[in-house]
């Protein structure tokens, strides 16, 4: 694990919890947004929780699996290769699935109704083994890079706000 001071920090005061994004992951998301990609893209979030299980550390936002479907306003994440990747991450680093990420090209990073519905399905589906999934959306506001981070917990949504390290 890198030093938490070298990561982007997002805070939710209601839950008294934080989500940290490793700088290399943050820079990669920034590059994807700057490239002005025309189609939505995305993947899964990999990382871990600290000892208190209160703060999440995001170590990777994967590329889209090869069987994903991307259009201008929709991204359907595929599954090809994810099972073996997650097994490898768990065995090598004790890292695991934390949630989903995707890009809203040229648009706000606020979650759509579809985004919220999909995350609630993940939260309540035992196959995902993720009762508190994180949704990370990359977008822009006033032509500036912006990330929305939402934790889904007990059928509620908790938004995280960027904070100083």
Regions found by a protein language model. Give the residues of each.
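Histidine-centered divalent metal-coordination motifs
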Residues: 102-104
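Conserved beta-strand-loop surface patch within small alpha/beta domains used
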Residues: 1-97, 106-165
């Amino acid at each position: 694990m890198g030093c938490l001071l070298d990561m982007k920090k997002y805070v939710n005061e209601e839950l008294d919890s934080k989500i940290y994004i490793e700088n290399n992951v943050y820079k990669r998301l920034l590059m994807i947004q700057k490239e002005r990609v025309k189609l939505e893209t995305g993947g899964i979030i990999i990382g871990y929780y600290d000892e208190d299980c209160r703060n999440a550390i995001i170590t990777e936002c994967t590329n889209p699996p090869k069987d994903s479907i991307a259009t201008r306003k929709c991204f359907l994440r595929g599954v090809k290769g994810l099972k073996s990747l997650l097994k490898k991450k768990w065995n090598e680093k004790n890292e695991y699935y934390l949630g989903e990420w995707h890009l809203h090209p040229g648009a706000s990073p606020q979650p759509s109704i579809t985004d919220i519905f999909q995350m609630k399905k993940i939260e309540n589906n035992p196959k995902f083994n993720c009762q508190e999934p994180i949704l990370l959306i990359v977008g822009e506001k006033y032509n500036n890079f912006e990330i929305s981070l939402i934790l889904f917990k007990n059928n509620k949504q908790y938004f995280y706000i960027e904070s100083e390290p």
